């Protein structure tokens, strides 16, 4: 009996030992109890963004190749249709924009839901920065999706955009498409809420969403909406903050 118990203990310990989570990134469905846990989840979201189907390659290739800024020579990667406009409905290259974008949104929504539960239970942790980053990232994801799958804002804002999903959904959920106008309204709301939660300073680590990241995205979103005064005001806030400097000459290998 002692050997049986010892064996069971050994196997249990081994399973626990092997089933370790990464310390620098994680899935939002895991346990979140502290600000540090929330940041690990945000790291995981940002890691997911680097997929080749999103910011790791295809998002940039899609726009630049279609705009004539570059030509794709490498064959066999499924990217030829980017510049030939020869799309097919069963190409995984294009569905990746949708699936990766909504995967990132799911992670953000789950994180925000977990934080809300912690706050309601009386947690003393200050999740303001984590929530601000998460809302800013969700705005970015929806901005990317509506630009890819919806018409330009002032061309037909009442036309279909993408589903506005702001909470975790079950696997069988079938959210309906919102209008382009509703998408942009959600984007601006997330940016406004996010900016109010972020400290008005530059993050110490490059690559993370901070207050000025949020304001820069506001400028870009408003530019796409042809709200030129709003875009200018947001851009001016960053320029006049003294935190960043404009590049006088943007050249490779580094701007000057």
List each language-model region with its residue ranges.
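Membrane-proximal, proline-rich intrinsically disordered regions
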Residues: 14-61
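Short coil/linker segments at helix-helix boundaries
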Residues: 125, 148-181, 185
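Conserved small/polar residues in nucleotide/adenosyl-binding loops
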Residues: 16, 250-255
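Conserved, well-structured interaction surfaces
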Residues: 78-149, 195-200
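Inward-facing hydrophobic residues that define packing positions of alpha-helical scaffold repeats
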Residues: 105-108, 184, 191, 235
């Amino acid at each position: 009996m002692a050997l049986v118990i010892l064996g069971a203990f050994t196997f249990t310990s081994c399973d626990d030992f092997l089933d370790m989570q990464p310390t620098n990134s994680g899935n939002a469905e895991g346990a979140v109890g502290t600000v540090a846990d929330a940041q690990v989840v945000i790291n995981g979201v940002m890691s997911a963004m680097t997929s080749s189907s999103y910011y790791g390659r295809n998002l940039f290739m899609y726009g630049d190749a279609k705009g004539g800024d570059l030509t794709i020579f490498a064959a066999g990667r499924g990217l030829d249709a980017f510049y030939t406009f020869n799309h097919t409905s069963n190409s995984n290259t294009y569905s990746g924009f949708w699936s990766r974008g909504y995967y990132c949104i799911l992670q953000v929504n789950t994180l925000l839901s977990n934080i809300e539960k912690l706050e309601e239970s009386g947690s003393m942790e200050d999740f303001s920065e984590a929530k601000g980053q998460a809302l800013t990232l969700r705005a970015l994801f929806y901005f990317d999706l509506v630009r890819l799958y919806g018409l330009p804002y002032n061309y037909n804002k009442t036309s279909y955009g993408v589903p506005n999903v702001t909470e975790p959904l079950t696997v069988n959920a079938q959210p309906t498409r919102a209008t382009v106008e509703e998408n942009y309204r959600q984007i601006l709301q997330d940016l406004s809420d996010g900016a109010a939660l972020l400290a008005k300073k530059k993050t110490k680590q490059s690559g993370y969403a901070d207050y000025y990241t949020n304001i820069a995205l506001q400028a870009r979103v408003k530019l796409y909406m042809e709200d030129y005064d709003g875009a200018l005001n947001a851009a001016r806030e960053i320029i006049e903050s003294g935190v960043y400097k404009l590049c006088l000459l943007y050249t490779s290998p580094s701007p000057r």
